[in-house]
Amino acid sequence: MNANTVLPPGLLLVLSAPSGAGKTTLAHRLLKETPDAVFSISVTTRRPRGKEREGVDYNFVDVATFQSKIERGEFVEWAEVYGHFYGSPQSVVDEARARKSAAIFDIDVQGGQAIKRKHPDAVTIFVLPPSMEELERRLRDRQTDSDETIRRRMLAARSEIERGIASYDYVVVNDDFERAFSDLRSVVVAERCRRERVDVSKLGLGIGG
């Protein structure tokens, strides 16, 4: 970027991680401490699990409704995963741009990469567990998955970690939650202060957007 480049308004924050790394807890803490932020609630065609709530954890729709949303361009990214469709609403991006606020996406690497391709100014942050052993321990401590499910999650985690480390802008290790959140918040502060995000046109110096 040259000195006169100005990025679009709003800060698109993408958080990804393998299951059990703690990204959702970090994302909700960030939302709580960022009053003007918009949180992206994914749309999915799968059925609710456990205590999941409509409009809180996901927006649950049938396949026909999802396909209609695709045709109307209502998703900033969407994908089919294990026979179910998942998508992130374009309206979240539009709202963050209009309000010059932050949009927070809690999605997988595939979705994060899709957003980055469409919006190169998006900030991608990958949350790592301190070790694979600790990740497996966390999954077992949930006491919600069978041994076979945990085995599949661990295999998927290795692939997700490799892709995240290779392509994401930042990596945050979630060993201690408060330290991890401090690191995450530091990324947000630094990105807000990037030269390309600061409008200096009002200074009347003939620079900036």
Swiss-Prot record:
Which residues are the signal sequence here?
Answer: none
Reactions it catalyzes:
GMP + ATP = GDP + ADP
Q: Report any Pfam family annotated for this entry.
A: Guanylate_kin
The family database entries (SUPFAM superfamilies) matched by this protein are listed as: P-loop containing nucleoside triphosphate hydrolases
Alphabetical list of InterPro entries matching this protein: GK/Ca_channel_bsu, Guanylate_kin-like_dom, Guanylate_kinase, Guanylate_kinase_CS, P-loop_NTPase
Residue ranges of domain Guanylate kinase-like in the record: 10-189
Which residues are involved in binding ATP?
A: A17, P18, S19, G20, A21, G22, K23, T24
Name the PROSITE patterns on file. Answer: GUANYLATE_KINASE_1 (PS00856), GUANYLATE_KINASE_2 (PS50052)
Q: Where in or outside the cell is it found?
A: Cytoplasm
EC assignment? 2.7.4.8
GO cellular component, as recorded: cytosol
Record keywords, A-Z: ATP-binding, Cytoplasm, Kinase, Nucleotide-binding, Transferase
A GO term for molecular function: guanylate kinase activity
For this protein, the record's HAMAP family field holds: Guanylate_kinase
What is the stated purpose of this protein?
A: Essential for recycling GMP and indirectly, cGMP.
Family named by the database record: Belongs to the guanylate kinase family.
Q: What is this protein called?
A: Guanylate kinase
